[in-house]
């Protein structure tokens, strides 16, 4: 759980409070293609909100990447850019892109934000299942 260290240390976990929406229940793509998963964020101050992306395979919940206040994508996976996250400020949407798909990328992917109030709460969307099929 090393990957979950800093994004989750101060947050309670809450799923599906309606402030984040992943409209596709599942996405199917062939091996070696790319998949995009979108997350509509209905929160004030979208431009200042960091969007975090996770995936769950079996019982393993893994932190992947985040995109914050700027337009720049934050790639993961070196020069190959296996995983990228971006924000569209016009539509209040964050998109996760998984490139060079392999069978091991098959999982349920979740977007999340951390919101403050009397305490920090991490809010999750309901998730999108990625299915990877042979070419």
Curated annotation (Swiss-Prot):
Phylogenetic classification of the source organism: Eukaryota, Metazoa, Chordata, Craniata, Vertebrata
Signal peptide positions on this chain: 1-18
Record-linked SUPFAM superfamilies: Immunoglobulin (SSF48726)
Region feature (J segment): 115-135
Alphabetized InterPro entries for the sequence: Ig-like_dom, Ig-like_dom_sf, Ig-like_fold, Ig_sub, Ig_V-set, TRG_var/const_region
Pfam families xref list: V-set
Entry GO terms, CC: T cell receptor complex
Protein name as annotated: T-cell receptor gamma chain V region 5/10-13
BP-aspect Gene Ontology terms: adaptive immune response
PROSITE patterns, per database record: IG_LIKE
Gene that produces this protein: Tcrg-V1
Keywords: Adaptive immunity, Immunity, Immunoglobulin domain, Receptor, Signal, T cell receptor
Residue numbers spanned by region V segment: 19-114
Entry-linked PANTHER family: NON-FUNCTIONAL T CELL RECEPTOR GAMMA VARIABLE 10-RELATED, T-CELL RECEPTOR GAMMA CHAIN
Organism: Mus musculus
């Amino acid at each position: 759980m090393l990957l979950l260290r800093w994004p989750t240390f101060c947050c309670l976990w809450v799923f599906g409070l309606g402030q984040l929406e992943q409209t596709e229940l599942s996405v199917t793509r062939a091996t070696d293609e790319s998949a995009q998963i979108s997350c509509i964020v209905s929160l004030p101050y979208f431009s200042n909100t960091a969007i975090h992306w996770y995936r769950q395979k079996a019982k393993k919940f893994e932190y992947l990447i985040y995109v914050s206040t700027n337009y720049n994508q934050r790639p993961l996976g070196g020069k190959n850019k296996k995983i990228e996250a971006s924000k569209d400020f016009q539509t209040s949407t964050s998109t996760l892109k998984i490139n060079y798909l392999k069978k091991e990328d098959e999982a349920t992917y979740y977007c999340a934000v951390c919101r403050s109030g009397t305490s920090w709460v991490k809010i999750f969307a309901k998730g999108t299942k990625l299915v990877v099929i042979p070419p």
